[in-house]
Structure formats: C-alpha cells, structure tokens
C-alpha cells in the first residue's frame, strides 16, 4: 500500500501539514517495499489558484492509495475520491511518523464527504459585502 502524508518538512519527524493543496512536501511511504520513503516537494504550494487540483494530480501520478492530511478542499477531494484514493484526517500538531502509526492502528478518521454549506463560505452577503451590516455597504435612497 502506498500512503501519502502532507508534511511541513522533508522527513518523518516533521509535522503533518494541515493544508492539502498548499502543503510544503508530500511524503510517500510504500509499505510493501519495506517502508520505502519518497519525498516530493509540492509544486503547487505557491500557485495563485488551483493549488488543490495540482496537488491532487501529483498524488494521483505517484500512485498513492491513501492520503493523510489535516484539511482538504472540495475540488481535490473530488479528484482523489474519483481516482479511488481514500482520505484520512490527521489531528493538528501530530508528527508524520505518528500519523502513519495511527493510520496502521485504525485511529484516524476517514473523510468520506465534505460539508458544502450554503454560499460556499461567502457568508450571508454571498461575497457582495451585504452581510450582517444593518444596511452598511449598501446605499439606501
């Protein structure tokens, strides 16, 4: 099994990066080949847009079967799931080696769906600035 873990550093003692699309490194661990480790720098870390999709494509190209990360957006989530890759959430502040150990012991939660609420994070003003401002931001004539 090939496992991908988002990481803030290039080794197993680094912390799991909570951001999938903007993580600094992907650490791939191949359990079948005596824990062979491959570290790949995330090219999408400084992308203006589309970082999540580009990161997902990197993981797919590396033939990962499982991803362990902190948080993941809807676009990379859909891309990974449609490729048959399972996604697990690591708790904040955990080291890569500990997340890997927790995965093997079935202590991590699989992310099977994302909550996509109304407005997709834009709030009540739907991105136009007409939120809970009691009329502020909108001219009244």
Q: What do these predicted ranges mean?
A:
Residues 34-35:
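Short coil/turn linkers that define WD40 beta-propeller blade boundaries
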Residues 22, 46-54, 93-141:
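Extracellular/periplasmic low-complexity linear segments
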Residues 1-3:
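Extreme N-terminal starter segment of soluble prokaryotic enzymes
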Residues 26-30:
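Short beta-strand scaffold segments in enzyme catalytic cores
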